[in-house]
Amino acid sequence: MLVVVARKSSSSARVAAHQTRSHRAAMPAGQPHAHEPDGGGASHRRPQSPPSLPAEVVPAFAPPESEDEESWVWSQIKAEARRDADAEPALASFLYATVLSHPSLPRSISFHLANKLCSSTLLSTLLYDLFLASFTAHPSLRAAVVADLLAARSRDPACVGFSQCLLNFKGFLAIQAHRVSHVLWAQQRRPLALALQSRVADVFAVDIHPAAVVGKGILLDHATGVVIGETAVVGDNVSILHHVTLGGTGKAVGDRHPKIGDGVLIGAGATILGNVKIGAGAKIGAGSVVLIDVPARNTAVGNPARLIGRKNGEVEKDEDMPGESMDHTSFIRQWSDYTI
């Protein structure tokens, strides 16, 4: 159930400010505030003027339709975090540090990613500045963050709130880190982009090459074991389950990875190899090995994968966009009507 937040009046804003001050005062002794170092190499400071990045290196996502959508999602995240902090005091300090102490979604996600991906030699302060610079300079990246949050909330029945996705869904976090590494790759800052890819693979078990082009409205459901190769392209509103590989054939060079159209659904354990095209609205069955092009709104299953057709010879086409409907198994329930 979504938590709807009305606009605060001036009096309610003062109450909220008082509650925030009270919460900070009630934090356990020794617990760092959002601007203080934690003693373990991670600092919570926020830069005053993050360095800008040239717009031409960013994928051509559409900017937000309005600032209201991002603001609304952020208001839901904060409301959910306040509710959960009240209900579970053990999480209060964590929720304050990651969400409630930040004035915006870009700062919150930059802080959270930095502390997830830092190491003893790759400091959280450096990563925080890096993430925040990208999200601040490029509205298109922020639009993609919002679209991914909305995708998880609408498609994943296990997602009970935006804050759960932001804080706990490693597929979502891996995609946002990839967006920044893609910017670095296009800027020719390739050693840093590859270092970030390596940290994402270590922490989230998701391996996406920085050169891969990924759209918005992406759901990596469960996400463990997802591999996306260097020249792969993933369109908008695509849903990918765990242990999916978008790989090369092992011997080709150059443009050698799959091209995934908008609204595609790729089932768990599927492998798509080579520079093949998966058309918009196509569905790839779980465990399939795809070595051929799949036309738009068709379903491919099997090893090696083949297109599903009806017994009358007609090719079965989905009427909806599987990447959004998440319909994995309708072709199995009606199996007697189909041939492979």
From Swiss-Prot:
Pathways per UniProt: Amino-acid biosynthesis; L-cysteine biosynthesis; L-cysteine from L-serine: step 1/2
EC number per UniProt: 2.3.1.30
InterPro entries documented for this protein: Hexapep, Hexapep_transf_CS, LbH_SAT, Ser_AcTrfase_N, Ser_AcTrfase_N_sf, Serine_acetyltransferase, Trimer_LpxA-like_sf
Entry keyword annotation includes Hydrolase: no
Compositionally biased region (Low complexity): 1-17, 54-64
Reactions catalysed, as given in the entry: L-serine + acetyl-CoA = O-acetyl-L-serine + CoA
Cellular component aspect of the GO annotation: cytosol
SMART domains: SATase_N (SM00971)
Domain of life: Eukaryota
An example molecular function term from Gene Ontology annotations: serine O-acetyltransferase activity
Pfam families: Hexapep (PF00132), SATase_N (PF06426)
Keywords, comma-separated and alphabetical: Acyltransferase, Amino-acid biosynthesis, Transferase
Cysteine disulfide partners in this protein: none
SUPFAM superfamilies for the chain: Trimeric LpxA-like enzymes
Stretches for region Disordered: 1-67
Acyltransferase recorded as keyword: yes
Example GO BP: cysteine biosynthetic process from serine
Gene3D superfamilies: Hexapeptide repeat proteins (2.160.10.10), serine acetyltransferase, domain 1 (1.10.3130.10)
Similarity section: Belongs to the transferase hexapeptide repeat family.
Quaternary data: Homomultimer.
Name this polypeptide is given: Probable serine acetyltransferase 5
Organism annotation: Oryza sativa subsp. japonica (Rice)
Source lineage: Eukaryota, Viridiplantae, Streptophyta, Embryophyta, Tracheophyta
Gene name of this polypeptide: SAT5
